[in-house]
Regions:
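Catalytic cores of enzyme domains
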Residues: 1-126
């Protein structure tokens, strides 16, 4: 995780962000990881489309940590999928709760797994 000042410098390179509101309700907690993996793959497709539309610095922040690989190496240096791996917003010092609330989206800490999740991904656009 980079220091906050490095995160600020990174975000200063972007003028806009698109917030993706993703909802889900899992019957079993272990279903969250494959669900998240599939959502992340779809979000990468969106990022690529925006890139091909001329926004060459488009960058997606997944709704949680990168879960693209079934077995993560745990470090960027050893990652076997560096081209597609992306951080979650919290790893770049984004306060997701405050950010999404400021634009009217719902978010709360869930008390049980039978509650619907409100998850958020962010597409940064230059």
């Amino acid at each position: 995780v980079p220091p906050v000042e490095e995160c600020r410098a990174f975000f200063s390179e972007y003028e806009q962000a698109v917030i993706f509101h993703i909802t889900g309700k899992m019957e079993r907690p272990e279903d969250r990881v494959p669900w998240s993996r599939e959502i992340s793959k779809e979000l990468l497709k969106v990022e690529r489309e925006v890139f091909w539309a001329g926004y060459h610095k488009a960058f997606m922040l997944f709704m949680d940590e990168c879960r693209l690989c079934a077995s993560c190496t745990g470090s960027r240096e050893a990652c076997i999928n560096k081209e597609d791996s992306r951080p979650g917003p919290e790893s770049l010092a984004v306060d997701v709760f405050s950010t999404v609330r400021s634009v009217g989206y719902p978010i709360e800490v869930l008390r049980s797994y039978d509650q619907e999740m409100n998850r958020y991904a962010f597409l940064l656009v230059e």
